[in-house]
């Protein structure tokens, strides 16, 4: 217990330290600039500036010498009142920019450069496909709604972009029934996204995702009633969520934009994520405050850590078609090594974002031999999902996800999974819910031989609440709790007992604050407005 507790503390310190150290030598696009620039900019009638670096001012159009962005003209805005005052660097102005109080585009860019990028039709780009806005980028090559919030820290290095984000949940969790358990642990992950422009229409990207789960969770993982998948000491795990590998993504991508509406990309990951399923649960805004994995993880998004992935796709406007070849085998029990790439499976996905607030996808995949204990197993997976995100104002957001996943395994037939998640944030307070129903075989639940071939519908109902203790100052630390009720058929009582299945936990949620380029910081993202 002492080693585990030490690992939890070390994980939290590592997350905080990495975010802090990355600021050294970087240009933070959210950093306020000197007020004397404001006076200088208004002495000239026509100048050009960089929205990320307002101190760059020229008398001709072109590209920013620091980051390579297209320079924008400084335009004088009309004041709505004669008493409008010059903008300041006060945080209240940063949080609630007023159009009537802005004296110029540059002055407001100093308050919130990302706001002006939207005002002029400019956006920060995805590291996978330069035609996509950064807010659309989910796990792997998946799409989120364009209005999704981004929690992370962005830095610019001479035109290159680096984004850091992640989360850690130091907690106490307690699960009932004979198969339950209680423990102190800390699910966690941290990710870096980097992109470099090779010209106006070509970009390369790289991503690194890591987790200290092997230290904080150990090989058995954490207790989670009715969860299944993977193994420990050559025995199948049941009623526990397996830990993730130390290295969960190491990927490179190359994207090309052919015109305003058409682009294409290639993506290679070792490990990486194929074009199969919705964005992985920890990357969905609707699940970002829930420390637990969904019970349908191995029906919906379990391929997010795959040792050997190659994906190609093209996007036209808000529609994307992509296909992958990848390794079907899930990670082995050694969470610190690189597994052998096989490229023996394939998948395809169709994604469509009809509005800024909606992301839809359908996908199919053939997965060969996903489990080491069942080398002859062949799995056909089909998924569909709808993600709806609604910004409600400054630091207020409502995100929802529906996922359906179906596995068709050799010798077992088809089993279904359904999930609904919702996350409502208002200021420092967040309330979230998750409902799911999954059909699992007795073999999956590791029951006795007479029940192995039977299918059992199991479900979970979760309600959680988080209150931020620190908020919006670079690192959000929230104190949270959640309660889950699990339902099962009476025929499972011989394994779980007669008691009600439930779980509760108390946790800290530690993550970077909302990035100012996130959708909730922009004036056009008011309640009910879509673009």
Language-model segment annotations:
Residues 164-166, 204-208, 266-268, 312, ...:
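Membrane-embedded beta-strand positions of outer-membrane beta-barrel proteins
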Residues 217-351:
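Surface-exposed coil loops of outer-membrane beta-barrel proteins
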Residues 168-176, 210-216, 268-274, 316-318, ...:
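Transmembrane beta-strands of outer-membrane beta-barrel pores
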Residues 160, 182-190, 244-250, 304-310, ...:
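Residues that define the transmembrane beta-barrel architecture of outer-membrane proteins
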Residues 23, 102-110:
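Short Gly/Ser/Thr- and charged-rich N-terminal loops/segments
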Residues 162, 200-204, 260-264, 318-322, ...:
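Repeated loop/turn-to-beta-strand initiation elements of outer-membrane beta-barrel proteins
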Residues 498-531:
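Outer-membrane beta-barrel "beta-signal"
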Residues 152-153, 190-196, 250-256, 310-316, ...:
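Residues on the lipid-exposed face of transmembrane beta-strands in outer-membrane beta-barrel proteins
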